[in-house]
Amino acid sequence: MALIWAIVPIVNGITFTKVPIATLIEEGETGMTIRELCRNKTFWILMLMMLCAGASEQGVSQWASTFAEQGLGVTKTIGDLAGPMAFAILMGSSRAFYGKFGDRMDLDKFMIGSSILCIISYLCISLAPSAFVSLIGCSICGFSVGIMWPGSFSKASMALRRGGTSLFALLALAGDVGCSGGPTLVGFVSGIL
């Protein structure tokens, strides 16, 4: 059975070799160097946005199964499925919603609204007297953080048109640092309290 499933990534790998990859900058232009990026204030704001996007996304998704177990009174196996699944479904819904209606919406307003919703969901998670209500907060947080990562990339491509591959690699790095640092910070703070 494992050999049959191994065929899928092999076929995908072969298929991917035939996919044309568009360049990020026009022919004849040069992309921004890392030094130029580091001197740009907008770049640092985008890096902070990505750091926070990763931290807020993973900080909650790591705890969603615990809230599902306690809030619904289910086994660890069911909690591990229900909590992260609710988070992921709403996160995907947010991205699908913006993908469908994004041409009619202002990205800045959508991201600001999502940030406010994220703060509300964090307050709900941390201050609610019931684990079930905290689980609902986790799910809502999934919806609120859904646009943060792709929205930050979209803003970066609009703000730094010559950013090139270096820009997106560094933004992804900031997001990954947030993804590892967010749950660590949540665990540290919850351990103190």
Q: Language-model features: where?
A:
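Paired small-residue
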Residues: 121, 132-140
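Intracellular juxtamembrane helix-capping segments at the cytosolic ends
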Residues: 146-160
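C-terminal membrane-cytosol helix-exit motif in multi-pass small-molecule transporters
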Residues: 1, 5-26
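A late C-terminal transmembrane helix in Major Facilitator Superfamily
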Residues: 161-192
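Structural signature of the two symmetry-related core transmembrane helices
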Residues: 109-124
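Interfacial helix-cap and linker-helix signal at transmembrane-aqueous boundaries
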Residues: 68-69, 101-102, 157, 185-193
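Juxtamembrane intracellular "pre-TM" segments in multi-pass secondary transporters
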Residues: 21-46
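Extracytoplasmic gate region of multi-pass secondary transporters
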Residues: 40-85, 89-93
